[in-house]
Amino acid sequence: MRTMVLLGLAACATADQREEVHPTTPVAAPIPPVIVAPAPPPKPVIPSCVDDGKPYDLAVLKERVTFLASKELDGRAPDTDGDRTTRKLIADRFRCLGLTPAGSDYELPFDAGGKPTANVVGYIKGSDPDVADQIIYVGAHHDHEGKGHLGANDNASGIAGLLAVAQAVRQGEPPKRTIVFATFGGEELGMLGSYHLAAHPPEALPNAKVVQFINLDMIGTHNARGFVAAMGSLPKLASRPILDKIARKFPKISVAAGGRARGSDYEPLCKQGVPYVFFWTPDPKCYHETCDTADRLDYRAMADIAAVAGALTIEMANTDRDLAAARAKYGCGV
């Protein structure tokens, strides 16, 4: 209707009086809806290293194990993003605790069967001039098999325990002896990291001065019911009476002291005569299986086991017993 009126007016107008007709404004085509792809799941965040709370806090232990055994880290096999992220977490934590790097940095690189990786090593220098050159090692391997094998108990639990022990030592009085905290790569490939470190010790940490090795490997098995083996702590060794005394303070766990072990990172230094205590819980169902996940571990028992290991570390670092003479006499007891 409106179009017909406009045409009639245009026909009646003179040349000088023609009505100016504006073109019709074009109608914009409809904008197609924007399809937004769902956001990818957030990557796990490295737990903050700034905490001054209790070192054996259950929530912190669980947070660290959950992170280390996350699907994103995929089992922390050597030369993977999970391996590199794990080493960064450990090195950052050592840095925040004020540990001295064993080399130019905390990471000491080595080749794991053609795969570049690293051990992560920091230490607290002893405070007593008479025994400061003697060394207590606390070790745990940080790698696992990868490819869907997440390694919560083996050995995210040991790494979480080692970091807790390092915090406990740092929060206490300076130890008389030097305490080294070392996490190893390539353990699942044949203890490659610990053998490399034993063959190439940092200049500041000679093997001849190591008087005790404390190893944390698989300390969180959910069905161990509070049982932990403390292998290597034979009756004649200096660690045994100290461990027995500590164990009585933790009635909720059963510390099975004594016995010999094989197949973990204490082995290279044991072959050089260094005594060891190897904390371990059995895990027959999920050992090296995909069911070794963070949701099935016993964090309360893990906290107690880590606390026993921490107390042993501190007592061994401060004991008046002649640990160098004990090593010379008994070696690692095998």
What are these regions (language model features)?
Residues 16-35:
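Short, low-complexity, disordered segments immediately C-terminal to signal peptides
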Residues 47-55, 71-81, 108-111, 145-155, ...:
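Second-shell loop/turn segments in exported
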Residues 56, 60-63, 67, 81-93, ...:
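Extracytoplasmic/secreted proteins, especially bacterial periplasmic and envelope-associated proteins
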Residues 76-125:
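A non-catalytic alpha/beta surface segment that caps or lines the substrate-entry region
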Residues 122, 134, 138-191, 309:
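Alpha-helical metal-binding/catalytic segments enriched in His/Glu/Asp
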Residues 285-334:
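His/Asp/Glu-rich mid-to-C-terminal helical/loop segments that flank catalytic regions of hydrolases
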